[in-house]
Amino acid sequence: MTASTQNGSPTPPPAAPTATNQESKNMTANPADASESQSPANEKGGGTAENGQKHTSTAANAKDPLRPRRKKAKRACFACQRAHLTCGDERPCQRCIKRGLQDACHDGVRKKAKYLHDAPNEALMPGIRRNFYNQANATRTNASQQQNGPNSNSNKDSRQNVAANFYSPQSASNFDVYTQAKSQQGQGHIPPTVMQDTSINPSAFQAPSPTSTPNFDLSSNPPNRNLSSAMTQTPSSASNQTQDPFGAAFFDPSHPALFNFDIASMNFGNRYGALEFGMLGHMATGAGDTPPSDSATQRGSIGRSSGTFTAQNFGDSTNTQPPFLFGDPVLNDWNPSGQSQTNPRNNNIYNQNTVAGQMGEQHPNAFAIESAPMNFASPGSTESPQMTTMNQFDEANAKFSSRTALMHQTNPHQPPPISTPGLKHQGFQVGVKRRYRSPSSIYESVKEPYSYTSGFHNLTAFIQRRFSPQKTLQIAKALASIRPSFIATTKTLNQDDLIFMEKCFQRTLWEYEDFINACGTPTIVCRRTGEIAAVGKEFSILTGWKKEVLLGKEPNLNVNTGGSSPRGSGTFTPRNGNGVDPHSGMSASGGGGGRTQPVFLAELLDDDSVIEFYEDFAKLAFGDSRGSVMTTCKLLKYKTKEDSAALFQGREAQQGGPDGKGGGGGGGDVATTAATTSTSTSNGANSSGHANANRNNTNPNNSSPPSSSSAAAAGPLHGAQLSPKQTWGKRGIAGEAGMNQLGFRDGKVECSYCWTVKRDVFDIPMLIVMNFLPCI
């Protein structure tokens, strides 16, 4: 046998008897190679007879341009890959059929790429639709192969056994539910043992890791049956089912069938990379957040509930089985434990015990993407996962049942697909909704510029009243260094420019408000004059300052100024003389105008922090536009005169009792006295710890009875925690109650804070954004 014959070249065997005898011996020794060597020759000879062309022996070789060429397959089978021959996309391929190896024809294993070394072998399977045996291709292949005569019987056997022999036969035993269901389909019922099989029993889902999903062997191929036909009670529907279009993993959340991924059309060499690419695209498109068109929904842009998997995909469905694989409640009509389906708490595959076991005694576990609806979102550590999840399941099951009943009444065989806009009205809340305010309202509402001149005048007057002459001079020097720059940048601006500047400020503030609401860090935003323009809820909890007070919508009754230095005027006496701060909703600086005044940033910091801030602000205002400052400061707690009186009374009650119990008893007496006086409404819901005053600022002569502010200060949360000797550890600071106790002894909260300056289109400092974190 010549070398060309061994390599499968189309050169016909020589006519010499000796060569024929030698070839016959080789064929007897290796019949597979003999059939291979004859197949190209027969194929070439057939082509020559049909085209009516005659070729010489020199032209009938592999380099012949007229030789019909095979289309290169995306992945060769194992036999063709080992022989380095051209294979086809069909399974079994033509070469294996001619060699009689159709039973062992399967995809070859490629060498892993470096970035896939950590991927399991089961995840590197090729595309599902590409590798399943196509009936139409099988019919065409059978018609083209009938000319070969002896190969027709092998083709018939290959068509019958292709589904069972595509993967290893040993792995087919993992899915016991299908074998049991197949044996009972002819009888029209399914025994209860099928429903209690371990392959679909929720008790088999051990959840080894927070992000784990039910373990299904992707390397196995179940029998050619449909899930819906296996679970139905009519044998007629089971006989009409076609081949399963979704392969083996019916319950695997990472399976591409759950998202309508067409892996074969992605031109990936392996399933692992294609699935990762498709999942990233599914996440990036935000399915369920933005309502796409119905046509896009039918193509695969489905929402979180995966509602487009209807009975049209899975065959006929009876009234006892809704036409959804993964509905809003996860598989709520599967009842593996055999219990009654009237209890909505037990109608899902993740029953109450499973959910409680996964999320009960540990931190809230995460779930794989799209493995469950948004009802499985991780709750807070202080909530009860069992109660939260089950309440959400009750609501979801009720709505799902009503929708399923309506679909069965209209058309149980072809229910209409549920579009993503319809899912948004099912009661699924995804995060906090964006406020309905439109940016267009900002441009329509701003009609006049903001008076920064009066703001700086008010700031100067406040600094002169609060600080000593030496500290006032330090702040004045810092502001004087940037005053020429402000004058130079604003002297060319007209009225329209100033209005546009205010519109830019309001529009930027509109964006920052969303950021503040989404971020859990205590944050404030103020103008370049230091006036507070926006504040987060966490800042109010930390310092006790209400948002309405900071923004100038309510009177500012704070008397806590830190008390670290004597004031410039000797005493902090307001101009109106009635004990009300000038910035308490009255006219600015005691003058006319009737404009409410927001709180200045200097009112929130102690003396040293204010001086340090303005020195840094002078360097950063017209310096580095992307720069920021990170340092420490002391925030002043909000305290009124009534809070000071309540704290003073608590200290007097403390002195009469033992050290170990005096603090708690005194605090309790204050709480009782304050509670009998009025309700805690003055200082807001987030500022219930306002009895955290500095003892240096406490006026012993002031014996006014506690008002509503003192009631808030000595409420039930903090009535027994007013002892100045009490210390707080890291474990004691938890929730709003713990944050309110920070700085309750001296009225100061030591914080680390970072702030930056944002400029407008005229390169003028527009606003200051500050983030605080308490030092515990």
UniProtKB/Swiss-Prot annotation:
Biased composition (Low complexity): 142-155, 218-229, 670-714
Keyword Membrane annotated: no
Pfam families the UniProt entry points to: PAS_13
InterPro entries, per the entry: ERT1_acuK_gluconeogen_tf, PAS_13, Zn2-C6_fun-type_DNA-bd_sf, Zn2Cys6_DnaBD
Entry annotated with the keyword Transcription regulation: yes
Location of the protein in the cell: Nucleus
Biased composition (Polar residues): 21-41, 50-60, 195-217, 230-244, 292-322, 334-351, 557-576
Similarity section: Belongs to the ERT1/acuK family.
Annotated function: Transcription factor which regulates nonfermentable carbon utilization. Activator of gluconeogenetic genes.
Name by which UniProt lists this protein: Transcription activator of gluconeogenesis HCAG_03671
Organism from which the protein derives: Ajellomyces capsulatus (strain NAm1 / WU24) (Darling's disease fungus)
Taxonomic path: Eukaryota, Fungi, Dikarya, Ascomycota, Pezizomycotina
